[in-house]
């Protein structure tokens, strides 16, 4: 991440984003510089307009909070059905003659609906 930040600093200060300048920024920040990562970053940013990329990223709409995709809701419904089937199976085989709901954990159903 610090490599990208170095490129952003260079862009903001109107310096050329090249291997030498990125290495200088990283060394000034005390980062152990890997030349292969510097070369890869410079190659990746060669045809990129950084200002345009920043504006595009800043203008992108934020995802709606609390919303979920329809597929996720359906999967949750399937899980609820499976849980209900498991509970029904558990109720039939757990009849030890003890009507103490607390001991069986059945009293918790009222708390969680």
Swiss-Prot record:
Q: Which Pfam families does the UniProt record give?
A: Ribosomal_60s
Q: Which GO terms describe its biological process?
A: translational elongation
Cite the record's note on assembly. Part of the 50S ribosomal subunit. Homodimer, it forms part of the ribosomal stalk which helps the ribosome interact with GTP-bound translation factors. Forms a heptameric uL10/P0(P1)2(P1)2(P1)2 complex, where uL10/P0 forms an elongated spine to which the P1 dimers bind in a sequential fashion.
Q: Where is this region: Disordered?
A: 56-113
Similarity remark: Belongs to the eukaryotic ribosomal protein P1/P2 family.
Q: Name one GO molecular function term.
A: structural constituent of ribosome
Q: What is this protein called?
A: Large ribosomal subunit protein P1
InterPro entries annotated for this entry?
P1/P2_N_sf, Ribosomal_P1/P2, Ribosomal_P1_arc
Function recorded in the entry: Forms part of the ribosomal stalk, playing a central role in the interaction of the ribosome with GTP-bound translation factors.
> What is the superkingdom listed in this entry's lineage?
Archaea
Entry keywords, A to Z: Ribonucleoprotein, Ribosomal protein
For this record, the Gene Ontology CC terms, alphabetical, are: ribonucleoprotein complex; ribosome
Does the keyword section mention Transmembrane helix?
Answer: no
Show the ranges annotated as biased composition (Low complexity): 56-66
Q: Where is the composition biased (Acidic residues)?
A: 74-105
The protein's organism comes out as Haloferax volcanii (strain ATCC 29605 / DSM 3757 / JCM 8879 / NBRC 14742 / NCIMB 2012 / VKM B-1768 / DS2) (Halobacterium volcanii)
The answer to whether UniProt assigns keyword Ribosomal protein to this entry is yes
